[in-house]
A protein has these predicted regions:
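Glycine-rich phosphate-binding loop of ATP-grasp-fold ATP-dependent ligases
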Residues: 188-209, 226-230, 259-261, 284-300
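Compositionally biased, intrinsically disordered low-complexity segments enriched in Pro/Arg/Gln/His
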Residues: 23-24, 158, 167-171, 177
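ATP-dependent carboxylate/phosphate-activation module, predominantly the ATP-grasp catalytic core
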Residues: 264-316, 349-375
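A long amphipathic alpha-helix within ATP-dependent nucleotide-binding catalytic cores
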Residues: 242-252, 285-340, 374, 378-388, ...
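Phosphate-binding site of ATP-dependent enzymes
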Residues: 231-286, 335-344, 353
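Intrinsic-disorder-associated, low-complexity terminal segments enriched in Asp/Asn/His/Tyr and depleted
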Residues: 29, 165, 174, 179, ...
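Conserved N-proximal alpha/beta basic substrate-recognition cap immediately N-terminal to
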Residues: 29, 42, 58-159, 164-166, ...
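ATP-grasp fold ATP-binding core
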Residues: 184-205, 238-255, 332, 347
Length: 396
């Protein structure tokens, strides 16, 4: 009798445990991570700390544009704008269960894959495999502390050359004797820190280096102008090297006619889905302007690139994204020049981006709607769709 009672008791415990596990599983399925517009995430990746505090201007942007998260809330992209250690910590402080959050190891790999260093190596491999003369990027190079450039920046005597300011104006300045190897010295260059977004951490730098000139060829040049320019070039590059471990240098594409991107999502089973194209506008410094909210047919008309080449690039990106540990939204920024050439990968955004938002907004509202996505503010930031464009307005 006692044995039978014990068996029935154990059977009851098994059923209760099974029911509890089933209910817990169902609860986890119903739970989701709150959507969050944390546009400072790229800076948080650079800082690589759990307690990251963005600059006040960026804090204001995130607060003013918080309602943007409603665009992807309830979709398969529900969650943060981007992942980092700081994002994970923020969710912990919000009370999100640890089992719903990614591991630190996964976040470390996402940080590496999000770096422009990775994009630089990715482009080199892409060009070597596809071998298409219409593809640009052969001058895109990564420079770190192991590069001879590090010594050149810190020990070499100044050399006179030419710099290009953000307006594209050339001026003579002390730029430092720096050897960029295969990068042609007759062209302007754009310098980028490993992690940044919307034009931050990006500037146009010096050209026309002449190692044989070690004195000022123009004695009438204002020495203060020289000092400022040297600071804005060499010291910024030294800052990139010391704070983020390096920087990317590439040709400055003065003949650029279009910014566009390919948007993907990597599923947890590592299948990759091409979501579509996005077309956007940036300022000369790389700052975000707007995205077109239009049909794919209209966006392809704007891009106007050989379809076969685009399909080859899509296939390449899908194959290589599937080989990473990452899962989630991806945007690969590209550009087109006046002769029809395209840069296949300026950077890889392993996060939500304005291009994917534009795709979602087209699905929700079409191309002709005027929509205030965030509250109208007398001072601060506002997001809206107007005249077929997704824009972020700023009033200081």
């Amino acid at each position: 009798m006692r044995k039978r009672f014990i068996c029935e008791k154990r059977r009851g415990e098994i059923w209760r445990n099974a029911l509890f596990s089933l209910l817990l599983s169902a609860k986890r399925d119903l739970m989701s991570i709150p959507s969050l517009f944390n546009c400072s995430n790229d800076m948080a990746l650079a800082a690589h700390v759990r307690q990251y505090v963005p600059p006040k201007r960026i804090q204001q942007m995130e607060a003013d544009l918080a309602d943007l998260a409603r665009v992807w809330e309830g979709t398969r992209f529900a969650g943060p704008w981007g992942w980092s250690l700081a994002t994970k910590q923020r969710y912990r402080q919000m009370g999100v269960a640890g089992e719903l959050l990614p591991s630190d190891e996964w976040l470390e790999e996402v940080r590496r894959l999000s770096s422009r260093e990775f994009a630089c190596r990715y482009v080199k491999e892409l060009l070597g495999e596809l071998k298409d003369e219409r593809l640009l990027g052969e001058e895109m190079r990564w420079v770190d502390k192991q590069s001879p450039l590090w010594d050149a920046l810190t020990t070499s005597k100044p050399t006179w050359g030419t710099s290009v300011d953000r307006r594209g104006a050339r001026r003579q300045t002390d730029v430092g004797h720096v050897d960029f190897g295969a990068v042609k010295t007759s062209r302007a260059r754009i310098f980028k820190s490993p992690w940044s977004s919307s034009g931050r951490g990006v500037f146009v730098g010096s050209v026309d280096f002449n190692p044989n000139l070690n004195s000022n060829p123009n004695p009438n040049l204002d020495p203060n102008l020289d000092l400022n320019c040297k600071s804005s070039t060499l010291k910024r590059l030294q800052g990139f090297l010391s704070s983020q471990g390096g920087f990317v240098v590439d040709r400055f594409y003065e003949d650029k006619v279009l910014d566009f991107a390919m948007e993907f999502v990597v599923h947890k089973d590592h299948t990759v889905e091409f979501l579509g194209y996005s077309v956007f506008q940036t300022g000369e410094s790389g700052a975000y302007g707007y995205n077109y909210v239009e049909s794919q047919e209209e966006l392809l008309r704007r891009i106007d690139v050989d379809a076969a080449l685009l399909h080859r690039l899509i296939a390449y990106h899908k194959e290589h994204l599937a080989q990473t540990v990452y899962h989630g939204p991806v945007g690969i920024d590209m550009l087109k020049t006046a002769d029809g050439s395209i840069h296949p990968c300026l950077e890889i955004n392993l996060r939500l981006n304005m291009g994917i938002l534009a795709l979602l907004l087209f699905e929700q509202y079409g191309s002709g709607a005027t929509v205030a996505l965030t509250p109208v503010r007398e001072h601060g930031f506002q997001a809206l769709v107007e005249d077929g464009r997704l824009m972020i307005l700023s009033e200081k």
